[in-house]
Curated annotation (Swiss-Prot):
The chain crosses the membrane at residues 6-26, 48-68, 81-101, 129-149, 158-178, 181-201, 236-256, 274-294, 335-357, 386-406, 412-432, 438-458, 508-528. It holds the Pfam family SSF. It is a multi-pass membrane protein. GO terms for molecular function: lactate transmembrane transporter activity; monocarboxylate:sodium symporter activity; symporter activity. This is Sodium-coupled monocarboxylate transporter 2.
Length: 617
């Protein structure tokens, strides 16, 4: 394809993004230099307000994968992606009401500390290793996506832009810690929205108005959103997105270190919940912008598809190619779009680096060397940020082999996030599950999700389940037009038509449900965990969310865990005292090899006023 070059103003706009992002890191490095503690560096001293945290949460997972991948997906497969509107709502409600209260009230820094408190160290370490692998792989995809966009629209060296992204993210993460990451994310979120709106306004104007865009999309069957086919092999249906998508995104939001780390950095639990709910508005806005961008792109290319005509070589190049055509006579605006794509990437990569440094320090370094000074702890945390910045940037090389960025990213989250969601669900929702069941469940979930995902990579799903909607090249007028036809599949085993053909959104469903089922069964076979041995702040049965269930049923769900639901409101009103007490209890628990086996409700280290205030729901 012909490479269209940036004008001077495009470079100015694009460079401004990097300069401002780096400047925020320098600002917080100088401002917080006298607060040299690992707590301040990793969780912002737990004094953040909900506004910037909400923007940061949205920016962290609405990356260049969303900016480039979602419009391309809508262009090829239709607007069914908008059903994630429902998915996001369910995920945020479950996260804020089910998972967040447990993590926030436990006083933890790493979500995997919870697993040691609830089960033991082996479970904690196994989960931490899986999270590290998952995050490094996902970050590689996120770094590669905007680098590809920049390469296509400017001819700028692909790997040069990859390393530029990694260097800037690592720079402000290492200097400024979580506060720098959160405030930089907030700035980048604004850039993302402005970039999307610019494309939508100019694109719909060029197409003759929004009404004409929707009419063209309807004629091209792009608005057939509500497909209620229950076949789990279909790539995107109402049920695939609402069920499989919920499991996938709950793994991202409900138990993911990057999300929870921001929530527990808030000054109160109320602020943490507000951050999640305001973040939901951001998710919806970005989703709608991305979907309408895809529809606008279809209205523009409906008679000459650049992908099947051979003008571009991959679907993820559609959006940058569209932008360069749209703004070819408007210097600065192509640079704004690329800044939009890079904003999503910078925020996601920074969040990943910060989260990786946190879990590595808390789960490995601190547990091995508990007497480190604050100054040394801070320097080690910064060193870990630098190390993971290098690793994540290097992993982007492998991302070029993964195909479409949106499917690759969500597949990675599904393969690892589903079993992790199942593991935390076992700990929080099922008081009777023991550490043997938890560990066996995690391994079972990982094996199942990787089995189906790797099988799908080797034996791609049949074209009838994944082939795009019709695309036209009638008015391209090119001699090298190629017609896109379904690939001819060689001899395939029967399992490739069923198990391996499962929608990528169900990888998380398989991993989570497999983990829970195995965990419950193994716990029954090896001896159930005694409820009286578990501190009640580590448990939150689903029955606790519904006031209409009888007291007898609620007592049954708690499985013998000693608690007093009557003081829950008092706990929320005394949040600061409660949080301090929780952290004290946390340290008592982490000093033991495993809190649960040796827990004694009569022990003086647990029986104090602070704990009485924090351990009731």
């Amino acid at each position: 394809m012909e490479v269209k070059n940036f004008a001077v103003w495009d470079y100015v706009v694009f460079a401004a993004l990097f300069i401002i992002s780096s400047g925020i890191g320098v600002f917080y490095a100088i401002k917080e230099r006298k607060k040299a503690t690992s707590r301040e560096f990793l969780v912002g001293g737990r004094q953040m307000s909900f506004g910037p945290v909400a923007l940061s949460l949205t920016a962290s997972f609405m990356s260049a994968v969303t900016v480039l991948g979602t419009p391309a997906d809508v262009y090829r497969f239709g607007a069914s992606f908008v059903l994630f509107f429902i998915t996001y709502g369910l995920v945020i409600i479950l996260t804020s009401e089910l998972f967040l209260p447990v993590f926030y009230r436990s006083g933890i820094t790493s979500t995997y500390e919870y697993l040691q408190l609830r089960f033991n160290k082996p479970v904690r370490y196994a989960a931490t290793v899986i999270y590290i692998v998952q995050t490094i792989l996902y970050t590689g995809v996120v770094v590669y996506a905007p680098a590809l966009a920049l390469n296509q629209v400017t001819g700028f060296d692909l790997w040069g832009s990859v390393f530029a992204t990694g260097i800037v993210c690592t720079f402000y993460c290492t200097l400024g810690g979580l506060k720098a990451v959160v405030w930089t994310d907030a700035f980048q979120m604004v850039v993302m929205i402005v970039g999307f709106l610019t494309v939508l306004i100019q694109g719909s104007t060029y197409a003759g108005g929004l009404h004409n865009v929707l009419e063209q999309a309807e004629n091209g069957s792009r608005l057939n959103i509500f497909d209620f086919d229950i076949d789990p092999l279909r790539r995107h249906t109402f049920w695939t997105i609402s069920v499989g998508g919920t499991f996938t995104w709950l793994g991202i939001y409900g138990v993911n270190q990057s999300t929870i780390q921001r929530c527990i950095s808030c000054k109160t639990e109320k602020h943490a919940k507000l951050a999640l709910y305001f973040n939901l508005l951001g998710l919806w806005i970005i989703l709608l912008c991305a979907v309408f961008s895809g529809l606008t792109m279809y209205a523009h290319f409906k008679d000459c598809d650049p992908w099947t005509s051979g003008i571009i070589s991959a679907p993820d190049q559609l959006m940058p190619y569209f932008v360069m055509e749209l703004f070819s006579t408007m210097p600065g605006l192509p640079g704004l779009f690329v800044a939009c794509a890079f904003s999503g990437t910078l925020s996601t990569v920074a969040a990943s680096i910060n989260a990786l440094a946190t879990v590595t320090f808390e789960d490995f370094v601190k547990s091995c060397f508990p007497r480190l000074s604050d100054k040394l702890s801070t320097w080690i945390s910064k060193g870990l940020c630098l190390l993971f910045g290098v690793i994540c940037t290097s992993t982007a090389v492998a991302a070029s082999l993964m195909g479409g960025v949106i499917q690759a990213a969500l597949s990675i989250h599904g393969m690892c996030g589903g079993p992790m969601l199942g593991l935390f669900s076992l700990g929080i929702l099922f008081p009777f599950v023991n550490w043997k069941g938890a560990l066996a469940g995690l391994l079972t979930g990982i094996l199942l999700s990787f089995w189906v995902a790797i099988g799908a990579f080797i034996y791609p799903a049949p074209a009838s389940k994944t082939w795009p909607l019709p695309l036209s090249t009638d008015q391209c007028g090119l001699s090298n037009v190629t017609e896109s036809v379904p690939p001819v599949l060689s001899s395939r085993p029967a399992i490739a038509e069923t198990w391996y053909a499962l929608s990528y959104l169900h990888y998380s469903t398989v991993g989570c449900l497999g983990c829970i089922a195995a965990g419950v069964i193994i716990s029954f076979l090896t001896g159930l965990q005694k409820g009286k041995d578990i501190p009640p702040l580590l448990i939150r049965p689903v029955c606790n969310l519904f006031c209409f269930w009888s007291k007898k049923y609620k007592t049954l769900c708690w499985c013998g865990v000693q608690h007093d639901s009557g003081t829950e409101q008092e706990n929320l009103e005394n949040d600061s005292t409660w949080k301090q007490g929780a952290e004290s209890v946390l340290q008592n628990g982490l000093k033991q090899e495993s809190l649960v086996p040796g827990y004694d409700p009569k022990d003086k280290s647990y029986d104090n006023m602070a704990l009485e205030k924090i351990t009731h729901f």
